[in-house]
């Protein structure tokens, strides 16, 4: 019975793609898609690449649509890129090669948030996340 429950829970995890996160991005700001809003607070999966971290061995990292060799948000005048999601992991993350594709699973948080420790501002986050390398 326990295996069936686990399988059912895993089957219900929605796979969110970067293309479906936002409905629009205008001068008035980002508008989240109905798919993103419906997944708020739920366990979801996303696929992408780990951006180079702000500091090594932290409990968070940034998931990007495409591999990046430099920090995608370090410019002081940068606006929030639509192709990144902040990942707060269950445990300390040791950075992996930026060109290795990963799948992340965690609880989706939607809306502006300022990290009290780093001051990092995010629009979308996955909490209690875990990741694995994929091909």
Model regions and ranges:
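OB-fold and OB-like single-stranded nucleic-acid-recognition modules
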Residues: 10-135
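N-terminal signal peptide c-region/cleavage motif recognized by signal peptidases
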Residues: 4-6
């Amino acid at each position: 019975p326990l295996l069936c429950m686990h399988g059912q829970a895993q089957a219900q995890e929605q796979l969110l793609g970067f293309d479906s996160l936002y409905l629009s991005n205008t001068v008035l700001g980002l508008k989240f898609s109905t798919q993103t809003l419906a997944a708020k607070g739920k366990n979801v999966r996303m696929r992408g690449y780990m951006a180079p971290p702000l500091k090594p061995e932290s409990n968070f990292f940034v998931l990007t649509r495409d591999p990046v060799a430099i920090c995608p948000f370090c410019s002081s005048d940068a606006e929030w890129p639509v192709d990144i999601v902040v990942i707060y992991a269950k445990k300390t993350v040791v950075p992996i090669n930026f060109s290795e594709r990963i799948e992340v699973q965690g609880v989706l948080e939607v809306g502006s948030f300022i990290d009290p420790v780093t001051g990092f501002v995010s629009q979308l986050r996955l909490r209690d996340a875990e990741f694995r390398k994929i091909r």
